[in-house]
Amino acid sequence: MVVYFSLGTNLGDKEQNLRMAVQKIRKQIGEVISLSAFYATAPWGFSSDNTFLNAALCVDTALAPLEVLQTTQEIEREMGRTHKSVNAVYSDRVIDIDLLLCFADDDTPVLLDTPELKLPHPLMQIGRAHV
């Protein structure tokens, strides 16, 4: 399965945070097929003096989508993220890893609508550049 992620950070050494997240994804989820350049964005959905550094990532994995989600949440905790955004209340964070899209081995899009995971990521539809 091929999965697409967006990564974002607006605390600490942002470039190092992204590099560490990519390294952990490579080790725990699968082979990195491609990685975008890092790019800066303003906070979305809340006010902060800290701009975000973001990246997009494509990974080949043998994990199922919910396993990928659980693993990314473990990585976020390992890196110091103490809470997830709830009810669209956002805050500064060391790392945010969003699972955007998944494609099965036959290139069929994986569609999910569960309480834990929605694929494709619902905020992709509103044009959020860094989801």
What residues fall within each predicted segment?
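A general structural signal for well-ordered alpha-helical packing
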Residues: 18, 22, 54, 69-72
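N-terminal beta1-alpha1 ligand-phosphate binding loop
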Residues: 1-29, 36-42
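Short, charge-patterned binding micro-sites
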Residues: 36-60
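A structural signal for short, well-ordered beta-strand segments
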Residues: 7, 35, 55-57, 97-99
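Flexible, gly/pro- and Lys/Arg-enriched active-site loops
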Residues: 44-51, 63-130
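Small-molecule pocket liners
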Residues: 3, 55, 128
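Structured loop/turn residues at secondary-structure junctions
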Residues: 9-10, 60-63
